[in-house]
From Swiss-Prot:
<comment type="function">
    <text>One of the primary rRNA binding proteins, it binds directly to 16S rRNA central domain where it helps coordinate assembly of the platform of the 30S subunit.</text>
</comment>
<comment type="similarity">
    <text>Belongs to the universal ribosomal protein uS8 family.</text>
</comment>
<dbReference type="InterPro" id="IPR035987">
    <property type="entry name" value="Ribosomal_uS8_sf"/>
</dbReference>
<dbReference type="Pfam" id="PF00410">
    <property type="entry name" value="Ribosomal_S8"/>
</dbReference>
<keyword id="KW-0699">rRNA-binding</keyword>
<keyword id="KW-0694">RNA-binding</keyword>
<dbReference type="GO" id="GO:1990904">
    <property type="term" value="C:ribonucleoprotein complex"/>
</dbReference>
<dbReference type="GO" id="GO:0003735">
    <property type="term" value="F:structural constituent of ribosome"/>
</dbReference>
<keyword id="KW-0689">Ribosomal protein</keyword>
<dbReference type="GO" id="GO:0006412">
    <property type="term" value="P:translation"/>
</dbReference>
<protein>
    <recommendedName>
        <fullName>Small ribosomal subunit protein uS8</fullName>
    </recommendedName>
</protein>
<dbReference type="GO" id="GO:0005840">
    <property type="term" value="C:ribosome"/>
</dbReference>
<dbReference type="InterPro" id="IPR047863">
    <property type="entry name" value="Ribosomal_uS8_CS"/>
</dbReference>
<dbReference type="InterPro" id="IPR000630">
    <property type="entry name" value="Ribosomal_uS8"/>
</dbReference>
<keyword id="KW-0687">Ribonucleoprotein</keyword>
<comment type="subunit">
    <text>Part of the 30S ribosomal subunit.</text>
</comment>
<dbReference type="GO" id="GO:0019843">
    <property type="term" value="F:rRNA binding"/>
</dbReference>
Amino acid sequence: MVMLDLLSNALIQIKNAEAMGKRQVAIWPVNKLIYYTLRVLQRHGYVGEVEYIDDGRGGKYVVQLLGKINDIGPIKPRYPVKYREIVQWEQKFLPARQIGILVISTNQGVMSHVEAKEKKIGGVLLAYVY
């Protein structure tokens, strides 16, 4: 089986585990983009500890779930967004103001839309969570 989008696969694994009421989920295969996205989710309190386990086959992340995710998913296609356009995308993907985050890949790293607005930079939309 060929996995074309590892980030999308990881987010769907988290969504399914949350729906089943699991306390943790193992995500594999992994890459740096998944790690940085998980760190953003961790900083905003959507997931707990993220642990990397090297199993000799590329490794995997074990993510502690806190039960705070109502919906999570990738944004496809990955739209480029300017600093001033972030509010429009917020309205499109998030249920209300101040609820949830958009994950954005910028030239200064992967961050939430809140951090991107504070730094006044744009990037590419990766995912949403609330």
